Amino acid sequence: QRQMCIRDSTNRIERNMKRVAAYLGIPEEKLHIDIRWTMLMVNVSDEKHSFSKFQKCEKHGINMEAISKISKLSWRAIEQDYSLDKYEEELEKIARQERNYTPYVVAICTGFACGGFCKLFGGDWIAFLITAICTFVGFRTRARCIEFGINVYMSIAISAFLCTCLAYAFSFSGLSSTPYHPLLACTLYIVPGVPLINFVDDMIDNHLLVGITRAANTVMMVGGMAFGIAFALRLLVMSDVTIDQKFSELSMVPHDAYWVYAVAAAIAAMGFATIFNVQRRLLWVVAVGGIIAVCTRNFVNFELGYGPVIGSFMGSFVVSLIAVKAVHWFHVPNHVLTIPSVIPMVPGVLMYRSLLALINMRGVVGEVTLAFSNGINSALIIFCIALGVAVPNIFARRYIAKDRQRFLTQMLAERRARGKFIEW
């Protein structure tokens, strides 16, 4: 239940539950698990007895450190012969543990992360700072709205609206030579990267119900963001020809050196890592992952000419492939390293072009085609990013699973020899 609340993948939840069942001496064939988005159902039964437990999960929040610690705890409990009380005590410690970063530190880092997006989209360093300010205000606004009990999706819409209004106001300041780029980047902290990647992971692993629910949750979050942005654009009368042309004229081709994009990608990746509560010791690893992802994407896209969709897939694929080995170096789950690293590849320019095209429709021939072309391209890029992360991890699990099962069997045999094993 704790893993579902911190948005772990369904496959990992199932593996950990089976490992804990083995620690308790429950044979796998007598354990029946059904995982849903808001409900976890477990049944243990034999020919004479049947025990069922339903556990509800209402609040969902990303916590990468907790994901890592829960996984390690299930192994440690077997190795060190934990009593049930000791295991429960350790689990409660993980649940009560303070996050690595205070709310205001996370808000500041999120601001810099979206500033990194702005730089990746071609903005200057003043636009970077403007984006960081707008994002900081929007991020804290969303947090306050949720604290006051406002609906999550409405909180997202309010924060997106406020971010867009602030970025629009800054466009008149004359401080930046790229005044419209902050509008593209200031709300991208809302894009639900973790649910999206877990959705692809679940669908490939045949956890269809949870996968579809995650997809619906992702659509609702993006819908809330789009509503807030669209309302701001209408309220601020930003449907005029000049603004529309400015967004359509924004170049998708990099104009800066690769090292500039590497710095921006590292900042964005580390910023999102603080949102996901990644351990401090891993921030530099995530930064390197972000650099590899963005530079690979740009090389495949522009140097080899395969386009942004294939480029984004290859960027996330390479990072995920490296992470398959790196998880053994840093002793953390794959997603702790991969998800923050690939977030800087989110296609903000295409998303905005699609949204603006839909808002500014006046019945002219070709408007629908333009809107859907940008929308489909941005959706394909996001899907390929998620697919690139999921595929190497899924195939690696097939090979690692046998070794892991062999190791688990050996540990259980040693525990039985010590007289600590509970026979069912």
Regions found by a protein language model. Give the residues of each.
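Core alpha-helical transmembrane segments of integral membrane proteins
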Residues: 99-198, 275-276, 280-285
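C-terminal transmembrane helix-loop-helix hairpin of multi-pass membrane proteins
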Residues: 182-186, 198-202, 206-223, 256-258, ...
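Divalent-cation
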Residues: 10-35
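Structural signature of hydrophobic alpha-helical transmembrane segments
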Residues: 118-134, 179-192, 247-264, 305-317, ...
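Short, small-residue-biased leader/transition segments that mark boundaries at the very start
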Residues: 2-5
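Short juxtamembrane and helix-loop transition motifs at transmembrane-helix boundaries
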Residues: 85-98, 112-123, 139-150, 239-253, ...
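Alpha-helical membrane-inserting segments
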Residues: 116-117, 121, 137-145, 162, ...
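Membrane-interface helix termini and inter-helical loops of multi-pass transporters
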Residues: 173-179, 237-253, 358-373
